[in-house]
UniProtKB/Swiss-Prot annotation:
This is Shk1 kinase-binding protein 5. The keyword Membrane does not apply. It comes from Schizosaccharomyces pombe (strain 972 / ATCC 24843) (Fission yeast). One of its GO terms (molecular function) is protein kinase activator activity. GO terms for cellular component: endoplasmic reticulum.
């Protein structure tokens, strides 16, 4: 019989209804994951490039792309938009996962969430979150 060993492992969940730059994309545990990633040390980045004349180390520099280089210039184009909506009333969010808006504001509805709530995206702010279904009028 094989001997069982206990090793630490990390399970990561993603909520793809939120864009990657939104904290809820990584779930409520995003801060815990960030702390774990900061403690993680990957020795491969400290090794020198083999076959290189100079002894520069590989670094993990982040690369940012200009929005103009992107195939889509419309932020909501990466989402599956079910319908456009117009806010009938002002809504002040009570929780971090809710999206606030003002009367007349246009939103993109991404999906239904739970009874009476929709998941919406606001092109103007680039944010997404839950909105009360009775506060918006869907444009079909």
């Amino acid at each position: 019989m094989a001997e069982e060993t206990e090793e630490d492992y990390l399970v990561v969940g993603r909520d793809y209804l939120y864009p990657p730059d939104h904290e809820l994309h990584y779930g409520f545990h995003a801060r815990v994951i960030e702390e774990e990633e900061e403690r993680f040390v990957d020795d491969t980045f400290d090794e020198t490039i083999e076959g290189s004349d100079d002894s520069e180390s590989i670094d993990d520099t982040e690369v940012f792309y200009d929005a103009e280089e992107s195939e889509s210039t419309h932020p909501s184009a990466s989402f599956n938009v079910l319908a456009d909506a117009v806010a009938l009333y002002d809504f002040e969010p009570l929780h971090d996962n809710e999206l606030g808006f003002t009367t007349g504001q246009r939103l993109c509805i991404l999906s239904e969430s739970s009874d009476g709530w929709l998941i919406a995206y606001d092109d103007a702010s680039g944010r997404s979150g839950l909105v009360p279904e009775t506060f918006v009028k869907l444009e079909v």
